[in-house]
């Protein structure tokens, strides 16, 4: 099954392609622009690569398996959104709002999560290589089993995050962080 195109997806009686065009005008401050409100939208398995959703409202949206590579989502509200197995590689999500979002098994390498609210988000088994989590709120976030090689966690309070089973040996950690070794199983 291939990815769905924006022109074939509808939300609240409007074509997604039209919503995205109006949002682009809004983002540029041009006449006729309207902020995209895609709260609760079914955008699963959609091809949204490179789309500008800066400041868009995507609360509770279903983006499972969606291609958002190289997208622009700074300041977007993705609270409680389903991003399971989504492709977010090299996406800018600076200051986005994602509390309670599900990013299980997401391809999120190279994502800019700078100063994001990721509280209680689920990143289990996600690919998070080379992500920037500087200044992000990760309280209650679940990273267990995630690939976080070369992740930037400086200026991030990770005390409330579940990092079990995560290899942080190549990550840039907060000052004073002492890696805790996993207990060794007897041979």
Residue ranges and their predicted role:
Residues 4-18, 24-187:
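Tandem repeat scaffolds
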């Amino acid at each position: 099954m291939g990815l769905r195109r924006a022109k074939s997806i509808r939300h609240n009686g409007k074509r997604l392609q039209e919503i995205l065009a109006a949002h682009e005008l809004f983002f540029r401050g041009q006449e006729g622009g309207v902020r995209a409100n895609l709260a609760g939208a079914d955008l699963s398995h959609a091809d949204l690569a490179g789309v500008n959703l800066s400041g868009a409202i995507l609360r509770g949206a279903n983006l499972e398996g969606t291609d958002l590579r190289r997208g622009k989502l700074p300041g977007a509200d993705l609270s409680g959104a389903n991003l399971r197995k989504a492709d977010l590689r090299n996406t800018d999500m600076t200051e986005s709002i994602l509390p309670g979002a599900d990013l299980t098994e997401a391809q999120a390498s190279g994502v800019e999560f700078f100063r994001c609210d990721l509280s209680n988000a689920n990143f289990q088994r996600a690919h998070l290589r080379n992500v920037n989590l500087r200044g992000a709120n990760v309280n209650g976030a679940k990273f267990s089993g995630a690939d976080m090689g070369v992740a930037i966690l400086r200026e991030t309070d990770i005390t409330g995050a579940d990092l079990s089973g995560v290899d942080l040996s190549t990550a840039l950690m907060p000052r004073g962080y002492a890696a805790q070794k996993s207990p060794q199983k007897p041979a």
